[in-house]
A protein has these predicted regions:
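Conserved AMP-binding/adenylate-forming core of the ANL superfamily
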Residues: 12, 35-68, 77, 81-83, ...
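A short N-terminal helical cap/helix-turn-helix that marks the beginning
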Residues: 12-36, 161
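Adenylate-forming
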Residues: 26-27, 52, 56, 76, ...
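A general structural motif
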Residues: 33, 71-73, 121, 157-161, ...
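Conserved AMP-binding/adenylate-forming
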Residues: 45, 62-106, 203
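Conserved AMP-binding A3 loop
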Residues: 46-49, 161-188
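Conserved structural elements of the adenylate-forming
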Residues: 55-59, 176-199
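Structural core segment of the AMP-binding/adenylate-forming
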Residues: 91, 95-156
Length: 203
């Protein structure tokens, strides 16, 4: 089944409400559309955008429970290699009400602790347990990926910021925080690229 993407329509919709919630809703608006493919043995598997929306919601409910109501609005680091669950991991954190700090998945325990302290973060979603201050909440990604379905009536509360850091190899690394409006502005910049080369997206 052929799918088309209305770049102009989506861009205009995003301009109407430049929030992470609206960006997520627009991204997942064609729920039946394939979003990602991977191989399990010889079998081709896929997630649709509807699948990713639901997984994001499931992860959000799990993270809200693990990280706590009182920590909503604060930063939580994501320290995870690229994988098929990365999309719902990121959006699940945002939908749970926590701002996302993106960290290099290969940082040492010492540098991970340093970056968490610099960002005022309350925890980290990680592929391995770190030897860091016990005051930080550590959520293992393998546990998150097994999260049960979100309970009926669970309502996401979207956060509004994403933080990136320069190479975390020295103690002088810097953290840059992007409010949701700035994130949406960056997304809208892709419209200019599409105008220059329409083959980027099948329109």
């Amino acid at each position: 089944m052929p799918y088309t993407t209305d770049i102009m329509g989506r861009s205009n919709s995003l301009r109407q409400s430049m929030t992470l919630k609206n960006l997520f809703d627009i991204t997942c608006s064609q729920g039946e559309r394939p979003a990602s493919h991977w191989l399990e043995g010889e079998q081709d598997r896929l997630y649709t955008y509807g699948d990713l929306r639901q997984k994001s919601l499931d992860y959000a409910a799990y993270l809200a429970q693990q990280l706590g109501e009182s920590n909503k609005g604060r930063f939580v680091a994501i320290q995870q290699e690229t994988c098929k669950e990365w999309f719902p991991l990121f959006w699940g954190l945002i939908m749970a009400g926590y701002n996302a700090l993106l960290l290099d998945a290969n940082l040492s325990d010492e540098m991970t602790g340093h970056m968490l302290k610099e960002a005022g973060a309350v925890g980290v979603i990680t592929h391995r347990k770190h030897l860091i201050d016990k005051g930080y909440v550590q959520v293992l990604s393998e546990d998150l990926f097994k999260a049960p379905a979100a309970p009926a009536g669970f309502e996401p509360t979207f956060a509004d910021s994403v933080a990136l850091c320069t190479s975390g190899t020295t103690a002088t690394s810097r953290i840059f925080v992007y409010h949701e409006k700035a994130v949406c502005e960056q997304v809208l910049n892709s419209e200019l690229l599409h105008k220059l080369n329409t083959r980027i997206v099948d329109n």
